[in-house]
Regions:
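Conserved small/polar residues in nucleotide/adenosyl-binding loops
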Residues: 507-513, 532
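Hydrophobic cores of alpha-helical transmembrane segments in multi-pass integral membrane proteins
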Residues: 33-144, 159-185, 200-276, 285-308, ...
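Short, Lys/Arg-rich, polar N-terminal cytosolic tail immediately upstream
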Residues: 1-21
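Hydrophobic alpha-helical segments, chiefly the membrane-spanning helices
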Residues: 517-542
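Cytosolic juxtamembrane amphipathic/interface segments immediately preceding
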Residues: 16-32
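Inter-helical turn/loop segments and adjacent helix faces that build the functional surface
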Residues: 187-195
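Membrane-interface helix termini and inter-helical loops of multi-pass transporters
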Residues: 310, 380-383
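Solvent-exposed interhelical
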Residues: 281-283
């Protein structure tokens, strides 16, 4: 009883104030994690609406649904929102919520830094939304290449909104990375060595180190471009002694590791969910950790992969082409470990497992097309076509959204404190899976036929009309499926009965959970089971 009383007193001390004041001033990791996730979901909805507008415009030849200027703003904001305001913040929110529970600590190392990071993210995102709603959104593409975005060709304030807003978002990500790194290295439960951590914590640590290394170049580039636009200093203007390729180097030093920064947290979700769904232990824990570290290291040697058509020397082309192919090896190690885990166990097709199977199909196709574009002659032909857009979506949607949907269905009972109730999940998954592949397989096809990305219309004589119509209809099917997931979450939140905060709430699955359900902060209340790498409470196996 004394321990339970201490637990209740600590809960009262750490609880946020009721009402809006508590919401805006909270430094509790659970509150901030939910705030990150809800905000990221809101931006995902905005980005999805923009995607539907883009596909509506491209559904038929010579369409006048939107004009060229609005179309440029839509595709720029769609890419910006999905890459900067949805993908990375979703990882941040998930890690902020879960890591203390996984590590056996009451909160992260610097709670106020977590709150500061959230409000930086919210402010940067709000700047971009304001620009969109007032018709002054950036229109230079989500990677904002100079000289197109320089003061000569973009004299308005559209680009400035992007540069300032994204800088705040990047600062937010760095705050989260510092938080995760310190918490994982210094705030683990007594007895939890690094080799006994939950696998998701390893992925969070590797991703955080990548953020700390990869995001400063983009912040530097954004500051330099804004200074050039505001004060006329010629960092990227070739006619004044600058170098426009400098921006590409700075951006892709961030941008290509960003792909793996997005993928690795999703891989952490998969490595967590598969053993539970298969009712066995994770195969190759050490190999998976090593492959994640190798993937992080190799990702910083690939940035010129996006610059094969810029006239760089042939020796550089050969090196980066080989490195781009080599990165498939550590990725393959993880995929084989996941397949081996399922083979060793007895997987059951609950909702998380369905989305993981969708991930396997989609991500493998994306990986194969990635090897294709790593070959320089093919990249010269496919560069800046719809093929590249489709490949990117296969890697990022397949490598991130499907695993995150699995994570939502897996952890939602833990977050909500309600028993599992998902009435639309199977139908939603079918619509998402079929709609996604219909959209982007068609986009691969039309890209190989020569359709450039970012064009707002095309002539009927090109023969692209039927393929684009199939792609657009499929995208709306996918959107309906994603909307049904949202409805499923709402139904769960309002209809499902209260229950224990169990991570999956599949009561017939008896594998121990990875969460140390502690009732005090004393060291003796937590024990580490060296055989299962799981935290145990007292003598119960939880």
């Amino acid at each position: 009883m004394n321990a339970l009383r201490r637990h209740r007193k600590l809960d009262a001390i750490w609880a946020s104030e009721p009402g809006w004041k508590g919401w805006t001033s909270s430094v509790n990791h659970s509150d901030l994690g939910r705030m990150f996730l809800v905000t990221a979901l809101f931006f995902f909805l905005v980005g999805g609406v923009l995607a539907m507008l883009i596909r509506a415009q491209l559904a038929t030849p010579d369409s006048a649904f939107v004009d060229a200027g609005a179309f440029a703003q839509f595709f720029t904001m769609h890419g910006t929102i999905m890459m900067f305001l949805f993908a990375i913040p979703t990882f941040e929110g998930l890690a902020i919520y879960l890591l203390p529970k996984m590590l056996g600590t009451r909160d992260l190392a610097f709670p106020r830094l977590t709150a500061y990071g959230y409000w930086c993210y919210a402010f940067g995102g709000a700047m971009l939304l304001v620009a969109l709603f007032f018709g002054i959104a950036p229109d230079g593409g989500w990677f904002m290449y100079p000289p197109l975005t320089g003061p000569l060709h973009s004299p308005g304030i559209n680009t400035d909104f992007w540069l300032i807003g994204i800088t705040f978002v990047e600062i937010s990500a760095i705050c989260a990375a510092v938080e995760f790194t310190v918490s994982i290295l210094k705030y683990r439960a007594p007895g939890m060595s690094l080799d006994k951590m939950p696998i998701f914590a390893w992925y969070a640590l590797v991703t955080s180190l990548m953020i700390l290394t990869g995001f400063p170049p983009l912040i530097l580039g954004s500051v330099l471009l804004e200074v050039e636009r505001a004060f006329g200093l010629p960092f990227f203007q070739a006619d004044l002694g600058g170098d426009s390729l400098l921006w590409q180097h700075l951006f892709w030093l961030f941008g290509h590791p960003e792909v793996y920064i997005i993928f690795l947290p999703a891989a952490g979700v998969i490595s967590t969910v598969i053993p539970v769904m298969a009712r066995t232990t994770l195969l190759g824990y050490g190999w998976i950790v090593a492959s994640a570290l190798a993937l992080a290291f190799l990702s910083f040697g690939l940035w010129v992969h996006h610059m094969f058509t810029t006239g760089i020397p042939h020796m550089g082309l050969a090196f980066f082409s080989a490195a781009s192919t080599l990165v498939a090896v550590p990725t393959g190690v993880q995929v084989f470990a996941w397949i081996g885990t399922m083979w060793k166990g007895r997987p059951e097709l609950h909702m998380p497992m369905l989305h993981i199977l969708g991930f396997f199909v989609t991500f493998i196709i994306g990986g194969l097309t990635g090897v294709m574009v790593a070959v320089v002659p093919f990249d010269w032909q496919a560069h800046d076509t719809a093929f590249i857009t489709a490949h990117l979506h296969y890697v990022l949607f397949g490598g991130f959204v499907f695993p995150m949907l699995a994570g939502i269905y897996y952890w939602l009972p833990l977050v909500s404190g309600r028993k599992r109730l998902f009435r639309l999940g199977e139908l939603a998954f079918a619509l998402i899976f079929v709609g996604f592949h219909g959209t982007f397989l068609a986009m691969h096809w039309v890209g190989l036929l020569g359709q450039r990305r970012r064009i707002e219309t095309y002539d009927a004589e090109t023969g692209w009309g039927v393929i684009n119509f199939i792609s657009s209809v499929s995208s709306f099917v996918m959107a309906i499926g994603l909307a049904m997931v949202l409805v499923d979450i709402v139904i769960h939140g309002f209809v499902a009965v209260r229950g224990p905060r169990h991570p999956v709430s599949y009561t017939h699955l008896t594998l121990p959970t990875i969460y140390p359900v502690y009732i005090s902060v004393s060291a003796e209340s937590l024990q580490i089971n060296p055989d299962t790498h799981h935290v145990r409470q007292g003598t119960s196996s939880n």
